[in-house]
């Protein structure tokens, strides 16, 4: 499982020009989490990802999402598993198929909510437009 976590002051995701998820957090900051589920991920990788999103100290002042009750915008991003070493067209064979990935993304969202974190989401499998105001910029790649 891979994720790109970006510290933001606001972020939104739209499908067909309709906003389906948004966070606005100029005081605490928040996290835009682009998460890709891999075909070879362990059954409990989602739990590690929940912990990383909630506890990594990547907000202002070395605070975590849990420390300051910051919101998360969670967007499924299978393209994080694209292989680009050969040729000009990425291979997506390392990404989990949709029927495997979608429930994992839902487990991550639920796991964050169970920690009391506000979670907004994109729409799985849809063509989405993601907008963000990055802070820093501060972006990290998480693999688990």
UniProtKB/Swiss-Prot annotation:
SUPFAM superfamilies: DTD-like. It comes from the Bacteria. Transmembrane segments: none annotated. Keywords: Cytoplasm, Hydrolase, RNA-binding, tRNA-binding. One of its GO terms (cellular component) is cytoplasm. One of its GO terms (molecular function) is Gly-tRNA(Ala) deacylase activity. It catalyses: glycyl-tRNA(Ala) + H2O = tRNA(Ala) + glycine + H(+); a D-aminoacyl-tRNA + H2O = a tRNA + a D-alpha-amino acid + H(+). Its EC number is 3.1.1.96. A motif (Gly-cisPro motif, important for rejection of L-amino acids) lies at residues 136-137. It is found in: Cytoplasm. Disulfide bonds: none annotated. It holds the Pfam family Tyr_Deacylase. GO terms for biological process: D-amino acid catabolic process. A Gly-cisPro motif from one monomer fits into the active site of the other monomer to allow specific chiral rejection of L-amino acids. Belongs to the DTD family. An aminoacyl-tRNA editing enzyme that deacylates mischarged D-aminoacyl-tRNAs. Also deacylates mischarged glycyl-tRNA(Ala), protecting cells against glycine mischarging by AlaRS. Acts via tRNA-based rather than protein-based catalysis; rejects L-amino acids rather than detecting D-amino acids in the active site. By recycling D-aminoacyl-tRNA to D-amino acids and free tRNA molecules, this enzyme counteracts the toxicity associated with the formation of D-aminoacyl-tRNA entities in vivo and helps enforce protein L-homochirality. Homodimer. This is D-aminoacyl-tRNA deacylase. It comes from Corynebacterium glutamicum (strain ATCC 13032 / DSM 20300 / JCM 1318 / BCRC 11384 / CCUG 27702 / LMG 3730 / NBRC 12168 / NCIMB 10025 / NRRL B-2784 / 534). The lineage of its organism: Bacteria, Bacillati, Actinomycetota, Actinomycetes, Mycobacteriales.
């Amino acid at each position: 499982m891979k994720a790109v976590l970006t510290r933001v002051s606001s972020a939104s995701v739209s499908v067909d020009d309709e906003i389906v998820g948004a966070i606005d957090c100029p005081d605490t900051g928040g996290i835009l989490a682009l998460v890709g589920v891999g075909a070879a991920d362990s059954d409990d990788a989602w739990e590690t990802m929940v912990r990383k999103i909630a506890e990594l100290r990547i907000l202002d002042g070395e605070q975590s999402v849990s420390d300051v009750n910051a919101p998360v915008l969670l967007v499924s991003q299978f393209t994080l598993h694209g292989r680009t070493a050969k040729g000009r067209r990425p291979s997506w064979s390392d990404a989990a198929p949709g029927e495997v990935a979608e429930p994992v993304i839902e487990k991550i969202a639920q796991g964050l909510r169970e920690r009391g974190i506000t979670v907004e989401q994109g729409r799985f499998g849809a063509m989405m437009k993601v907008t963000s105001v990055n802070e820093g910029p501060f972006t990290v790649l998480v693999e688990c």
